[in-house]
């Protein structure tokens, strides 16, 4: 059988080990071929090919539920569930999503793009099953560092206290979280654990001894029974046993015979079970095996060399690169500066700080809540913590931002990379909401640069601001190629905007990444006889009302432009300020409406949302041709 013939995972039933190995090779070939062409997550999926095949051969996926953590591990799952013919469209507009999506397939039982959610979701499904008196299996597959997230540990703690709820957790240990040895001893211990006679002895030991000596030594029996149960458990497994799980493993995650035997046996164990599978991230592609962090995810690349496809022309440095370089220079001069990341050093540019000043760098793992409150503690002691995080992941620490930072007005700088449209990763990763969810918080200041040079200024501004927390958002991708400063940066005055273009017909207020597109739109409007004043707002909170309100009243029409959600966003802030002063002028808000933005290139998404320069100009032209509403 060829992989292309598999449209349902139950077709794996009955295949020989040799046939499964052939399917495994075909999965890796298709995975590599596709990601090299489209970009995407490379290492995680390559590491779980045999795990997926072995598990799915032991399940009935017309009934059973499998929940993949994060979702970027699940490319093999997609190839086995009817998406082979469309897999070449991975992460492309209207193509196969890069993460799991309940709308895309009946086998995507739970959507996920953020880490550490699978065990909680699986436990909910298992409890629903039990309520209905059903008997199907529920399996959560977690790993690739996701076990460092507090939510997964909360779920394990809860599930471990439900001895009558059958739930299997498969820990894909690819050395990104924990990594015990795999070998002959481990296989022997695992075999011993699964031996029915050993299980019978450990579960019935107490009753057998009581039969002969009575109840007088019950406390000692409990300790003896616990010791027997832990006899064959590797050290790491004892932790899960103490939390109420039956621990099985570690198992060689690339040995199909061992995986199938282990899963079949583990399915028979009642209650919560954890199967520990040791895998190699990037398995089957030597370049990715050697550089597991670098090949976690890739842009399109040359499969033979592993190198990125050359660009048609040189590109300016990315915002992340400018951020990392600038923060490192500032940290060299100020030992109070501490860069904090939640397992995203390379993506955020903090790997530059890590390399040059490791003592001023902290990686907390996938633990955003901890990162924020730890930063609050650092700020209490006079340090200058810089929490560097993707906009979408900062959502995970909202209570900590409110309770531990804002209420105490602590000087924590939040640097939100990937703010706005991020592209191929889709709705789980769009950075659309940060303006809205942070603007409502007392003591919070919000700013966004128009280009990479202003990013440098704002980074200096944030580090020097001591009156409370400050949020700095900036987009994914490359800057505009403007000249960068090497030193001598001065903080910007808080809450002050700048006028970039003068005109007498209307006021255009742009925030962050939309400043340059708005300037281009103003030029198009000029060609149509409309002269716009363009303001780089710089700050969404506090607004520069001393500048904005008189201009709005004088010019009589306002347009706001932002790369964020319209509900509660920058445009809403402007409307509120105008209303508070009873300045009743027409306001057109341009931004992201109340929809989910699916995976596509950033340019495709912006065109779909009406955020190109030409579309902004068209929207303004359409509005200016309408009579202004009465101010009465």
Swiss-Prot record:
Binding site for thiamine diphosphate: 72, 113-115, 145-146, 174, 285, 368
Top-rank EC class of the record's enzyme: transferase
One GO cellular component, as annotated: cytosol
Family: Belongs to the transketolase family. DXPS subfamily.
Lineage per the UniProt record: Bacteria, Bacillati, Cyanobacteriota, Cyanophyceae, Gomontiellales
Designated name of the protein: 1-deoxy-D-xylulose-5-phosphate synthase
PROSITE patterns: TRANSKETOLASE_1, TRANSKETOLASE_2
Gene3D superfamilies documented for this protein: 3.40.50.920, 3.40.50.970
Gene expressing this chain: dxs
SUPFAM superfamilies per the UniProt record, alphabetical: Thiamin diphosphate-binding fold (THDP-binding), TK C-terminal domain-like
Subunit and interaction comment: Homodimer.
The protein's role, per its UniProt record: Catalyzes the acyloin condensation reaction between C atoms 2 and 3 of pyruvate and glyceraldehyde 3-phosphate to yield 1-deoxy-D-xylulose-5-phosphate (DXP).
Cofactor binding description: Binds 1 Mg(2+) ion per subunit. Binds 1 thiamine pyrophosphate per subunit.
Record-listed Mg(2+) binding positions: 144, 174
Reactions listed under catalytic activity: D-glyceraldehyde 3-phosphate + pyruvate + H(+) = 1-deoxy-D-xylulose 5-phosphate + CO2
Superkingdom of the organism of origin: Bacteria
UniProt cross-references to InterPro entries, sorted A to Z: Dxylulose-5-P_synthase (IPR005477), THDP-binding (IPR029061), Transketo_C/PFOR_II (IPR009014), Transketolase-like_Pyr-bd (IPR005475), Transketolase_BS (IPR020826), Transketolase_C (IPR033248), Transketolase_CS (IPR049557)
